[in-house]
């Protein structure tokens, strides 16, 4: 029956329970449902407008035999129920009796928890159960003991199902990822055994019309196996969570329902021909769904129970269709710079000739429209690949190399060869300019040379540090310089006295100083340096000239002293770069004042001025870096910023933008698997958010090899459930592993990597459990 003619009388119903149920089962007439849980064992009648409680088998009993993991209803007798309890007890119930007599039989033969129980499809007295002890028991309710025991050679049997196609065949799935087929008459050995999943298999279900077996596992996959002859994988469905239950949809060959054990609370119906998105979803539950069942042959009614203590009767017409809300287009950027784009192909009817374009033909075309369930898997898409033209970038390597390879090689080459620390800035710029030139990045080469010219030979400090060096004479550096000048003052005084007596300096690069007032001599006749100034050497003067104090240099003289000085003496300045553009005055000796005013700051003539520009390049450099990022070269923009060191504080670039550059460049390095280079960039970052990237996703969660439980304790290899450290031992030699540990994600066993290399050179299965480990 197609989806377009669903039963519109079917509605969604909900009922709250006293406790959450672990399993559900329907009777042969599909008008009653049995619910079993840790504190729940009831039977409800299914009505058109809800559920009605008809039997409570637990009552006030607190026996663990009533704490059930699974429940099964006989397919031939509506009065017979079976439950599998957490203490390993398998109970048979007769609903036609009263009180305690309802518990017809109690089989206490399993040594550990019983996970599943099911009745034979054609024999009303036969049922089988699977347990954590790795055994399968076959019971005849006419006997008080099991009639057969099947040893699965695994740690736990999670589900068993009778085949609807062969009377004596049943399947069993285990926590070691294997699937077994057994003949009830041959208890000593299974017929077929194969590894279906790389993790525990929790559920299985036979297809009602085809010889297909569906399995669900912790690896978040649903697999459909063709059991005709040798088992073969037909379809695989990838889900987002661990699969807990699967049920084939009646009257729909390719539809199967599933629910998850964790994370995902919804019930999904999948079309195995389009496995990447559910055909329909039921999202009513607010906690993990623990059981699902179709109401007999009605493909539009689904029953589900959950840990939210509710039971739902879902109408298929109320299900959501994820495919209708999904984006039918997708795009991805490749590592070579190409772009892949996929979009849905719209189905258009072929154009017909004018003669045939009649009302009758259009009527026929409308009648042949396919149903929604059929159209779902017929949807298909087309993918396009867009390549970037060679003229897009200004970084060509050679005309013989294709554009994607150029960008790929230049990025990787620069990432590996660019140096961002460990040398002087001038050396870094020179090296990185050569690397950029080598890979044809001419704009980057120019930028590196510019950085070398303006930042490599000059020392830039924050503005407040520059101003304090001249305005605050109490600065420790200036105090040391004043002490040095005071110690050399007598010698300088003698030299200056000789110059003022008429001796002409031999060279034009010597220092001229104004006549010193007699007040600078103390009463004791001892000469002291001027208290209002500090005499600096030429080297010190040059090192002090920066952009912020450049205005202190006037006409070739640098003034050191109180800024409020009303008068300064001017002497003939020597020819240099700063005063070359100013007119020179020929001053005679008579024009000089014979005695300077008291407390006049010393005026020193600078013989050489460094080639510092009269403008600051910081804004220009920041604009250049932003432009490099805008054209897609975030590699150059960020490496320049890192190489600048403390000078980057002078650039007016927002930290949020720099953080975005870091994330972008690190992501690009990860795309090319340049892990070491990405780590170095992260370590050189001065932003806390970027520095913490190396601390993310460094933990590898493991499971116990004995019980399969995740290890989340404080001690690394100690299992809180098993109370042992068996997982820390090598499965080959049996000794505790110290150092490199090789671990199988499928069976959770491992050991010394050297021992496993030798073992798997000759074997293919795990030495401890027989799991088919994918060792490489």
Swiss-Prot record:
Its EC number is 2.3.2.27. Keywords: Autophagy, Cell cycle, Cell division, Cytoplasmic vesicle, Lysosome, Metal-binding, Mitosis, Repeat, Transferase, Ubl conjugation pathway, WD repeat, Zinc, Zinc-finger. The keyword Cell division applies. SMART domains: WD40 (SM00320). Zn(2+) 4 binds at residues 749, 766, 769. GO terms for molecular function: transferase activity; zinc ion binding. This is GATOR2 complex protein Wdr24. Pathway: Protein modification; protein ubiquitination. An essential component of the GATOR subcomplex GATOR2 which functions as an activator of the amino acid-sensing branch of the mTORC1 signaling pathway. The two GATOR subcomplexes, GATOR1 and GATOR2, regulate the mTORC1 pathway in order to mediate metabolic homeostasis, female gametogenesis and the response to amino acid limitation and complete starvation. GATOR2 activates the mTORC1 signaling pathway through the inhibition of the GATOR1 subcomplex, controlling the switch to cell proliferation and growth under nutrient replete conditions and during female oocyte development. It comes from the Eukaryota. GO terms for cellular component: autolysosome; autophagosome; cytoplasmic vesicle; cytosol; GATOR2 complex; lysosome; Seh1-associated complex; vacuolar membrane. PANTHER family: GATOR COMPLEX PROTEIN WDR24. A zinc finger (C4-type) spans 703-726. It comes from Drosophila melanogaster. It is found in: Lysosome; Cytoplasmic vesicle, Autophagosome. Component of the GATOR complex consisting of mio, Nup44A/Seh1, Im11, Nplr3, Nplr2, Wdr24, Wdr59 and Sec13. Within the GATOR complex, probable component of the GATOR2 subcomplex which is likely composed of mio, Nup44A/Seh1, Wdr24, Wdr59 and Sec13. Interacts with Nup44A/Seh1. Interacts with mio. Interacts with Nplr3. The GATOR2 complex associates with unmet in the absence of S-adenosyl-L-methionine; the mio-Wdr24-Nup44A subcomplex is essential and sufficient for this interaction while Wdr59 and Sec13 are dispensable. Pfam families: WD40. Residues 469-490 have a biased composition (Polar residues). Disruption phenotype: No effect on viability. Decreased mTORC1 complex activity. Decreased body size and weight. Mutant females have small ovaries, reduced egg chamber growth and exhibit a 90% reduction in eggs laid per day. Activation of autophagy and accumulation of autolysosomes independent of nutritional status. GO terms for biological process: autophagy; cell division; cellular response to amino acid starvation; lysosomal lumen acidification; positive regulation of cell growth; positive regulation of macroautophagy; positive regulation of TORC1 signaling; protein ubiquitination. Residues 466-490 are annotated as: Disordered. A zinc finger (RING-type) spans 728-776.
């Amino acid at each position: 029956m197609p989806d377009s003619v669903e039963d519109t009388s079917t509605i969604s119903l909900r009922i709250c329970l006293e406790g959450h149920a672990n399993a559900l089962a329907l009777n042969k007439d599909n008008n009653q449902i049995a619910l079993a849980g840790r504190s729940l064992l009831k039977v409800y009648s299914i009505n058109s407008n809800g559920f009605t409680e008809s039997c409570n088998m637990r009552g006030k009993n607190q026996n663990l035999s009533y704490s059930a993991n699974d429940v099964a209803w006989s397919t031939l007798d509506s009065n017979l129920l079976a439950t599998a309890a957490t203490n390993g007890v398998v109970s048979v119930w007769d609903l036609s009796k009263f009180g305690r007599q309802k518990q017809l039989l109690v089989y206490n033969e399993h040594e550990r928890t019983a996970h599943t129980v099911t009745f034979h499809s054609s024999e009303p007295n036969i049922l089988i159960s699977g347990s954590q002890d790795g055994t399968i028991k076959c019971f005849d309710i006419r006997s008080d003991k099991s009639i057969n025991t099947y040893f699965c050679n695994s740690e736990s049997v999670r589900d068993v199902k009778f085949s609807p196609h062969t009377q004596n065949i049943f399947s069993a799935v285990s926590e070691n990822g294997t699937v077994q087929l057994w003949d009830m008459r041959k208890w000593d050995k299974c017929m077929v055994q194969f590894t279906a999943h790389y993790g525990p298999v929790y559920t299985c279900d036979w297809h009602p019309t085809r010889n297909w077996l569906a399995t669900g596992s912790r690896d978040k996959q649903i697999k459909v196996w063709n059991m005709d002859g040798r088992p073969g994988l037909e379809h695989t469905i990838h889900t987002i969570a661990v699969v807990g239950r699967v049920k084939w949809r009646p009257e729909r060959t390719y539809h199967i329902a599933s629910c998850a054990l964790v994370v995902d609370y919804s019930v999904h119906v999948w079309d195995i021909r389009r496995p990447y998105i559910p055909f329909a979803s039921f999202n009513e539950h607010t906690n993990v769904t623990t059981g699902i069942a179709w109401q007999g042959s009605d493909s539009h009614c689904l029953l589900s129970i959950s840990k939210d203590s509710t039971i739902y009767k879902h109408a298929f017409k109320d299900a959501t269709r994820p495919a209708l809300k999904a984006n039918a287009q997708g795009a991805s950027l490749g590592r070579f710079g190409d772009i892949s784009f996929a979009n849905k192909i719209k189905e258009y009817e072929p154009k017909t000739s004018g003669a045939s374009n009649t009302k009758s033909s259009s009527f026929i075309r409308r009648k042949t429209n396919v149903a929604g369930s059929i159209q779902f898997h017929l949807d298909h898409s087309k993918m396009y690949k867009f390549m970037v033209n060679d003229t897009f970038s200004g970084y060509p390597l050679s005309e013989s190399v294709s554009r994607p390879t150029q960008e790929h090689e230049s990025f990787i080459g620069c990432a590996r060869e660019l140096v961002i620390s460990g040398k002087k800035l001038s050396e870094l710029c020179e090296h990185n300019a050569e690397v950029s030139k080598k890979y044809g990045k001419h704009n980057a080469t120019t930028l590196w040379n510019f950085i070398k010219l303006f930042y490599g030979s000059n020392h830039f400090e924050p503005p407040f540090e520059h101003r304090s060096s001249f305005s605050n004479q109490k600065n420790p550096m200036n105090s040391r310089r004043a002490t040095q000048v005071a110690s050399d003052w007598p010698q300088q005084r003698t030299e200056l006295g000789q110059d003022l007596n008429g001796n002409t300096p031999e060279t034009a690069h010597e220092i001229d100083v104004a006549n010193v007032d007699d007040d600078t001599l103390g009463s004791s006749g001892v000469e002291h340096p001027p208290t209002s100034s500090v005499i600096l050497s030429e080297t010190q003067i040059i090192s002090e000239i920066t952009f912020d104090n450049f205005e202190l240099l006037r006409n070739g003289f640098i003034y050191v002293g109180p800024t409020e000085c009303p008068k300064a003496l001017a002497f003939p300045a020597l020819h240099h770069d700063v005063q070359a553009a100013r007119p020179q005055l020929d001053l005679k000796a008579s024009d000089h004042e014979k005695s300077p005013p008291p407390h006049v700051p010393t005026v020193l003539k600078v013989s050489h001025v460094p080639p510092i520009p009269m403008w600051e390049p910081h804004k220009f450099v920041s604009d250049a870096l932003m432009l490099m990022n805008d054209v897609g070269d975030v590699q150059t923009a960020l490496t320049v910023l890192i190489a600048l060191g403390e000078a980057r504080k002078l650039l007016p670039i927002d930290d949020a933008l720099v953080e975005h550059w870091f994330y972008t460049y690190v992501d690009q390095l990860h795309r090319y698997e340049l892990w070491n280079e990405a780590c170095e960039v992260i370590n050189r970052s001065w932003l806390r958010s970027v520095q913490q990237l190396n601390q993310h996703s460094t933990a590898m969660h493991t499971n116990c090899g004995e019980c399969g439980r995740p290890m989340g304790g404080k001690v690394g290899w100690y299992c809180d459930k098993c109370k042992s450290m068996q997982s820390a031992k090598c499965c080959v030699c049996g000794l505790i592993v110290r150092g490199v540990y090789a671990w199988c994600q499928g069976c959770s066993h491992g050991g010394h990597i050297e021992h496993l290399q030798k073992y798997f050179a000759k074997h293919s299965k795990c030495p401890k459990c027989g799991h088919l480990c994918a060792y490489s």
